[in-house]
Amino acid sequence: MDMMKIIKKYINSEEEAQKLLKWAIDNANIYYLRNIVNTKVNIEETKFKTVHNIGIEYSKDNKYKLSYRNKPSIATNEKYKELCNLIRSTNGIEKETLRYLLFGIKCVHAKVEYDIEKVPDYDYSNYFDVLKEKSTIRCVACKSNNTIPMILQTRSSDEEPTVRVVCKDCGKNFAPPRLKFN
């Protein structure tokens, strides 16, 4: 199957098509999981002929269990119908690659990044290194600021936890100073 030919039906840029194909093949190889195929020989499907098509398809697995699946009453993915049909007709690693290609093509058309590794993340640096020297408690034994608070025991919501401060330099632990309320 010529994947490049399939991509070219949806994407005009040669460079973008090459990048997308490489990304899809890499991800399909990494995250490929075997799809468990229903091996039951007899699957009876009953289609309801209702006055109002509510979009539910009824399928009967065996005589004891019933399962319901949503069946869209409005055809979706008309723009990508050929690619969706290819996904249905293939299996294995090709199917996974085509699924990634479909996702990537939709992202390219929507002008969003398809590679999660390139999506900019939030800057969490403000949440780390919160225990600076100015905000840490001074050790009662060696007067060092290299201390860290530790919760030893948590209680119910109406009681405060047992907290001790441990000095990393001398190894002593002590109770934190109490705040006085007027």
Curated annotation (Swiss-Prot):
<dbReference type="InterPro" id="IPR024394">
    <property type="entry name" value="RNA_pol_30_chordopoxvir-type_N"/>
</dbReference>
<keyword id="KW-0862">Zinc</keyword>
<dbReference type="Pfam" id="PF01096">
    <property type="entry name" value="Zn_ribbon_TFIIS"/>
</dbReference>
<dbReference type="GO" id="GO:0008270">
    <property type="term" value="F:zinc ion binding"/>
</dbReference>
<comment type="function">
    <text>DNA-dependent RNA polymerase catalyzes the transcription of DNA into RNA using the four ribonucleoside triphosphates as substrates. Rpo30 may have a role in RNA chain elongation.</text>
</comment>
<comment type="similarity">
    <text>Belongs to the poxviridae DNA-directed RNA polymerase 30 kDa subunit family.</text>
</comment>
<dbReference type="GO" id="GO:0003899">
    <property type="term" value="F:DNA-directed RNA polymerase activity"/>
</dbReference>
<keyword id="KW-0804">Transcription</keyword>
<dbReference type="Pfam" id="PF12410">
    <property type="entry name" value="rpo30_N"/>
</dbReference>
<dbReference type="GO" id="GO:0003677">
    <property type="term" value="F:DNA binding"/>
</dbReference>
<feature type="binding site">
    <location>
        <position position="167"/>
    </location>
    <ligand>
        <name>Zn(2+)</name>
    </ligand>
</feature>
<keyword id="KW-0808">Transferase</keyword>
<dbReference type="InterPro" id="IPR001222">
    <property type="entry name" value="Znf_TFIIS"/>
</dbReference>
<dbReference type="InterPro" id="IPR009162">
    <property type="entry name" value="RNA_pol_30_chordopoxvir-type"/>
</dbReference>
<keyword id="KW-0240">DNA-directed RNA polymerase</keyword>
<keyword id="KW-0548">Nucleotidyltransferase</keyword>
<dbReference type="GO" id="GO:0000428">
    <property type="term" value="C:DNA-directed RNA polymerase complex"/>
</dbReference>
<comment type="subunit">
    <text>This enzyme consists of at least eight subunits.</text>
</comment>
<feature type="binding site">
    <location>
        <position position="170"/>
    </location>
    <ligand>
        <name>Zn(2+)</name>
    </ligand>
</feature>
<feature type="binding site">
    <location>
        <position position="139"/>
    </location>
    <ligand>
        <name>Zn(2+)</name>
    </ligand>
</feature>
<protein>
    <recommendedName>
        <fullName>DNA-directed RNA polymerase 30 kDa polypeptide</fullName>
        <ecNumber>2.7.7.6</ecNumber>
    </recommendedName>
</protein>
<dbReference type="GO" id="GO:0006351">
    <property type="term" value="P:DNA-templated transcription"/>
</dbReference>
<feature type="binding site">
    <location>
        <position position="142"/>
    </location>
    <ligand>
        <name>Zn(2+)</name>
    </ligand>
</feature>
<keyword id="KW-0479">Metal-binding</keyword>
<keyword id="KW-0863">Zinc-finger</keyword>
<feature type="zinc finger region" description="TFIIS-type">
    <location>
        <begin position="135"/>
        <end position="175"/>
    </location>
</feature>
